[in-house]
């Protein structure tokens, strides 16, 4: 197959190279299925992808950030920065027209004259599966072996720079007097002159490459047989994988090995039982008892509509009740590989020999102690659900409720005294509980012969609670994270409202003083400033009133709706997503214009919502 996608950027004047978005991809796949004998089958697959991606460079000069250029152009640019292109030359207004003479940002600064990237991806996939039936031993028994190999190579070519000479437009009198002449002067000349600024620079070139190889091997014994109303199946599986060139310790392959056992039972396809157990090992843990973990699970289901007492009713087409419990493990929580071993020694200051003529020698120290007891983070999960269908299966409904108890979370110990001479390793001591639910409704129907449509809606809720994180108790309970959700803002004041003129007393000299009955901040405040809560009740708002406040950065509620239709091969879909109970904080660069790196502009809704003497009642921001 072949895929080509083109971008939306136009060819801009003066730019002698193509930096538009372009995507070319060739993919291929070949499969061979063969019966080697009457009881032996083989499946061989070969596939791959050859791709090339081109995109404009989006690094903003002076910020060190690499962001989506369209987001940057909308949020950071100044609407009065310039008129665009005049006579084929990018035109800006003088930087003296913005506060502090900062850099002007127009909507093209993120990609015009910045260069472009080209990324070449090559992927090869091979897989082989051989199955041998063993019905001569017992019907339904078989053994299989499977092997897979993936090879990936990426080459990135970076062409940076390529700046293009621009021009700055001035009023003639402004340019002649260096801005000292007042525009109200009757002799002020407002004719426009264009002064070249900047210069053409060549593109610079660099390239980098990356690669990856993955091996996977699997052997399994399968059993699947039906005895009248009873169906029984079983699986015993061994697998191992090796990943070459991982991100950490690149030249040491990452290895996994595991055993899986599974048994299922069904009676008349209405009573269902599934039991699983996994025994997995990870190289991230020390050899011995901590390297391997046992992860059992089981589930049960009942399809009530398969019962005889449900045969004559015409309301419910399908009803299934289900419940499950399982334990899963995670070895990705480690901050680096091989945490059970001490980190490498490195230079750490120096020490001296002698008194009169001391000789200084470099000192070496271990950067991190090893933790031979580091092991799997585990989570015990429960799930209870119900599936329903009505009106000839046109209306469907699903409800799930889950409970999770997570232990062994790898965290940095907080209660250890600071007099310890080296950094302690992370420990498997964290505990978090989680619970929530998900509800979904769907309607699918057909009008006439060719028109089908669907409407689906869903809502989910999830909230966790920190049970233990080795937190040192703070002076006030509202400062502690334990007992609340993960991901909340720490060390913040609780916002109440904005100060108004009615909160102040005007002195004889016109100076505003906050009314004494209000809590007194440790800094002087004025109308329009944010009022924060006095949590400890000492009538002073200071560092003792900082708390763990608000919701986490991830939403507790997520709402979704999908709608679509299909008519004679033409289909249309749309998706709506919403969230609730979530807090995000904008960085200062997005709240105060012309600050910090990038000299960014201010979002309009921030400006419109700021407190001013004319906008006291409608203000939502200081």
Where in this protein do the model-derived segments appear?
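Short Gly/aromatic-enriched secondary-structure transition segments
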Residues: 160-161, 255, 472-473, 577-580, ...
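Catalytic-site beta-strand/loop segments enriched in glycine and acidic/polar residues
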Residues: 234-242, 272-281, 531-554
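Transmembrane beta-barrel wall of Gram-negative outer-membrane proteins
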Residues: 1-55
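Histidine- and/or cysteine-centered catalytic micro-motif in compact active-site loops
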Residues: 3, 402, 460, 575-579
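Conserved small-residue
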Residues: 58, 63, 337, 444-553, ...
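Glycine-rich, aromatic-lined ligand/substrate-binding cores of catalytic
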Residues: 139, 552-585
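Extracellular/periplasmic, surface-exposed regions of secreted and cell-surface proteins
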Residues: 31-40, 46-50, 59, 72-76, ...
């Amino acid at each position: 197959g072949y895929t080509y996608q083109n971008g939306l950027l136009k060819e801009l004047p003066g730019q002698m190279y193509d930096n538009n978005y372009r995507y070319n991809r060739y993919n291929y796949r070949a499969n061979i299925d063969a019966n080697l004998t009457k009881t032996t089958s083989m499946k061989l697959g070969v596939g791959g992808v050859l791709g090339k991606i081109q995109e404009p460079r989006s690094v903003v000069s002076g910020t060190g950030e690499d962001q989506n250029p369209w987001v940057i152009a909308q949020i950071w640019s100044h609407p009065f920065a310039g008129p665009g292109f005049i006579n084929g030359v990018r035109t800006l207004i003088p930087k003296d027209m913005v506060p502090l003479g900062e850099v002007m940002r127009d909507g093209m600064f993120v990609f015009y004259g910045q260069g472009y990237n080209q990324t070449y991806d090559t992927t090869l996939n091979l897989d082989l599966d051989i199955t041998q039936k063993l019905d001569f031993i017992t019907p339904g028994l078989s053994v299989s072996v499977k092997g897979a190999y993936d090879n990936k190579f990426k080459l990135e070519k970076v062409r940076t720079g390529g700046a293009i000479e621009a021009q700055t437009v001035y009023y003639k009198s402004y340019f002649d007097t260096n801005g000292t002449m007042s525009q109200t002067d009757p002799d002020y000349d407002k004719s426009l002159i264009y002064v070249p600024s900047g210069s053409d620079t060549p593109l610079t070139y660099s390239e980098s490459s990356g690669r990856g190889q993955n091996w996977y091997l699997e052997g399994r014994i399968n059993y699947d047989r039906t005895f009248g109303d009873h169906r029984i199946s079983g699986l015993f599986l061994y697998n191992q994988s090796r990943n070459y060139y991982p991100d950490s310790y690149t030249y040491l392959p990452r290895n996994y090995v595991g055993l899986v056992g599974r048994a299922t039972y069904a009676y008349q396809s209405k009573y269902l039982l599934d039991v699983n157990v996994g025994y997995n090992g990870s190289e991230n843990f020390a050899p011995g008892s901590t390297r391997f973990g046992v992860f059992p699970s089981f589930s049960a289901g009942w399809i009530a509509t398969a019962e005889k007492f449900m045969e004559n009713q015409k309301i419910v087409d399908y009803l299934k009740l289900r419940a499950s419990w399982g334990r899963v493990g995670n070895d990705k929580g480690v901050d680096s590989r091989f945490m059970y071993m001490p980190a490498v020694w490195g230079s750490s200051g120096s020490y001296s020999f002698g008194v009169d003529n001391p000789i200084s020698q470099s000192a070496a120290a271990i950067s991190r102690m090893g933790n031979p007891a580091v092991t799997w983070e585990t989570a015990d999960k429960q799930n209870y659900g119900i599936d329903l269908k009505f009106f000839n299966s046109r209306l469907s409904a699903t409800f799930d409720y889950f409970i999770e108890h997570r232990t062994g979370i790898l965290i940095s110990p907080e209660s250890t005294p600071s007099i310890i001479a080296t950094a302690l390793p992370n420990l498997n001591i964290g505990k978090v509980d989680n619970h929530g639910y998900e509800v979904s409704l769907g309607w699918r129907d057909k009008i006439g012969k060719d028109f089908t449509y669907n409407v689906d809606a869903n809502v989910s809720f999830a909230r966790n609670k920190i049970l233990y994180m080795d937190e040192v108790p703070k002076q006030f309970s509202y400062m502690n994270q334990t007992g609340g959700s993960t991901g909340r803002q720490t060390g913040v004041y609780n916002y109440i409202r904005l100060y108004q003129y009615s909160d102040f007393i005007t002195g004889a000299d016109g100076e505003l003083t906050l009314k004494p009955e209000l809590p007194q901040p440790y800094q002087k405040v004025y109308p329009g400033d944010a009022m924060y809560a006095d949590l400890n009740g000492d009538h002073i708002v200071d560092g003792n009133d900082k708390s763990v406040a608000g919701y986490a950065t991830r939403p507790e509620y997520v709402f979704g709706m999908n709608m679509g239709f299909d008519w004679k091969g033409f289909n249309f879909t749309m998706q709506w997503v919403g969230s609730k109970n979530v807090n995000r904080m904008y960085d200062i660069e997005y709240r105060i214009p012309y600050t910090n790196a990038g000299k960014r502009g201010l979002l309009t809704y921030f400006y419109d919502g700021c407190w001013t003497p004319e906008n006291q009642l409608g203000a939502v921001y200081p």
